[in-house]
């Protein structure tokens, strides 16, 4: 049975074969797989955000901190903070700051960089009245400029959940949510031309509502994100050839994390957000084995209210090129914000 241990009190944002990029409040740096720092510390933003980000509770409550990190093709680094995205050079200098997008930040898998170096940025905002146009942004110059590559008109969808590169098909996948008539806002799109055009692959029902997808040679896998509605949370497989989906099993709570690894393994995590379809107050880590997900670890929600932080386990970006499981626990008993690593 797989086991995990605490590595460092921080958030894991991006994983590489030889290091893990982590964030503590409004600063980021890289550590090796023993938790030793192997890069300079880079501070982000002004003194107010840095002060609020020093303490985990204030950082989680006010959504202050760093949320995404992407190493770019030219060795610069893109990071997202609340309502602002920065690009840093190798010396830790800010070379660009961008804030034209809507929302505090993208979804957890709402940014990606392709092997050719194109950066995609998917807008995520609450948008309860569906009165905002929603945009997918693209940069072809290493994050120095961003331009809208696709727009969903107000009333069409609520927001974008993820955009992710698929090494198997050499394409991009994008997911939207959350409700709509007959689940019309829940969609899966595919682009084979660097985001110029998007083919609608599937739509309707909560089974198309995902926060991200995992890739295998013959399928896409995801858990549904039906946290605040009564629908049962499902684990779904989509065949690459037929594009048909199959419900493999039920989950105990909404799927908040998923990650594929270079050795062929795939992991999924469920969270605690207070939805009526949750079976209990535990967040679970699951491994995909022989066509099903098996529970390998679980933690109970901590004492702090859900408005401060859901109880979740989240994977860093970049796992597809790595073989060792790394993730961050947040809002869980004894694991308020820890980077965990496979023993």
Task: Enumerate the language-model features and the residues they cover.
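Blade-level signature of beta-propeller repeat domains, shared across WD40, Kelch, NHL, RCC1
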Residues: 310-343
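Conserved Ser/Thr-centered positions that define the repeating blades of beta-propeller domains
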Residues: 31-32, 88, 139-140, 191-192, ...
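Repeated scaffold domains used in trafficking and secretory/extracellular systems
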Residues: 5-17, 49-54, 58-72, 103-114, ...
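Entry beta-strands of beta-propeller and related beta-repeat scaffolds
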Residues: 20, 75-78, 117-121, 169-174, ...
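Asp-box/WD-like beta-propeller blade repeats and closely related beta-sheet repeat scaffolds
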Residues: 88-114, 121-126, 148-153
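Loop/turn-rich, solvent-exposed surfaces of beta-rich toroidal or solenoidal domains
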Residues: 216-233, 248-304
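A short beta-strand motif characteristic of beta-propeller blades
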Residues: 39-41, 51-59, 94-101, 147-153, ...
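Short, solvent-exposed loop/turn segments at conserved positions within beta-propeller repeat blades
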Residues: 79-80, 127-133, 156, 177-185, ...
């Amino acid at each position: 049975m797989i086991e995990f241990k605490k590595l460092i009190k921080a958030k894991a944002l991006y994983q590489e074969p030889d290091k893990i990029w982590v964030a503590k409040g409004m600063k980021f740096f890289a550590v090796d797989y023993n938790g030793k720092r192997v890069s300079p510390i880079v501070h982000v933003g002004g003194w107010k955000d840095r002060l609020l980000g020093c303490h985990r509770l204030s950082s989680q409550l006010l959504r202050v901190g760093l949320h995404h990190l992407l190493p770019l093709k030219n060795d610069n680094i893109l990071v997202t903070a609340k309502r602002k995205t920065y690009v840093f050079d190798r010396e830790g200098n800010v070379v660009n700051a961008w804030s034209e997008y809507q929302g505090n930040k993208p979804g957890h898998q709402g940014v990606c960089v392709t092997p050719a170096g194109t950066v995609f940025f998917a807008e995520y905002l609450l948008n309860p009245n569906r009165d905002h146009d929603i945009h997918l942004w693209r940069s072809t110059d290493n994050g120095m400029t961003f331009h809208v590559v696709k727009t969903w008109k107000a009333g069409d969808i609520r927001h974008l959940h993820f955009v992710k590169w698929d090494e198997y098909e050499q394409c991009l996948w994008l997911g939207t949510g959350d409700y709509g008539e007959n689940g019309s806002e829940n969609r899966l799109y595919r682009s084979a031309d660097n985001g110029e055009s998007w083919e609608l692959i599937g739509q309707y029902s909560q089974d198309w509502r995902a926060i991200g997808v995992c890739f295998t040679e013959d399928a896409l896998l995801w858990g549904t994100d039906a946290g605040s509605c009564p629908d049962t949370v499902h684990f779904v497989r989509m065949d690459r050839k037929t594009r048909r989906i199959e419900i493999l099993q039920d989950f105990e709570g909404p799927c908040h994390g998923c990650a594929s690894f270079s050795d062929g393994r795939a992991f999924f995590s469920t969270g605690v957000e207070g939805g009526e379809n949750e079976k209990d107050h535990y967040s679970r880590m699951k491994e995909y084995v022989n066509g099903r997900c098996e529970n390998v670890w679980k933690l109970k929600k901590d004492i702090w209210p859900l408005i401060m932080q859901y109880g979740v386990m989240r994977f860093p970006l970049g796992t597809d090129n790595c073989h060792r499981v790394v993730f961050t626990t947040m809002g869980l008993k004894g694991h308020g914000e820890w980077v965990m690593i496979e023993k």
